[in-house]
Amino acid sequence: MPVNRRDVVKAVALGGAAMVSDGASAAPAPEARIVHHVFFWLKRPESTADKDQLIAGLRALAEIPVIRNLQIGVPASTEQRDVVDSSFDVSELMTFDNVADQKVYQDHPIHQDFVAKCGHLWRKVIVYDMLTV
């Protein structure tokens, strides 16, 4: 039976679609992680030295091995809207593989040292911990 070009094109297209479909459905779901987001309000927000000391202390936390990602920042100068709270002075966002690693971080000597050396700088701290979905 002779093979024509249309049959070949159809077969290739169907095979390619099947491969894409199979590959997409076989992709593993991303693993859930713990995100630890902390907001700090300084006792003296006008003090550059206090802010710099807090940021330096937060940077030192990067040495804790269970931290997968560490971001440190200050309020962005984005559009002012009712839903945006930019009243904090410094924030840090960390990612952990699981709750056990977050506990290791909490108990780690570097974290304990950070709290001891920088705790006098802030008047308020709010923590949001979440499990990614």
Language-model features, listed with the residues they occupy:
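N-terminal secretory signal peptides and thylakoid transit peptides that target proteins
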Residues: 1-16
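Hydrophobic membrane-targeting signal helices
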Residues: 15-20, 63
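C-terminal segment of N-terminal export signals and the immediately downstream linker at the start
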Residues: 20-49
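Short, glycine- and small/hydrophobic-rich beta-strand elements in well-ordered beta-sheets
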Residues: 23-28, 62-89, 123, 127-132
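Short, well-ordered beta-strand segments in beta-rich or mixed alpha/beta enzyme
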Residues: 33-42, 73, 78-106
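Short amphipathic alpha-helical segments
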Residues: 46-72, 109-119
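Surface-exposed, polar helix/loop patches in the mature regions of secreted/periplasmic/lumenal proteins
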Residues: 94-132
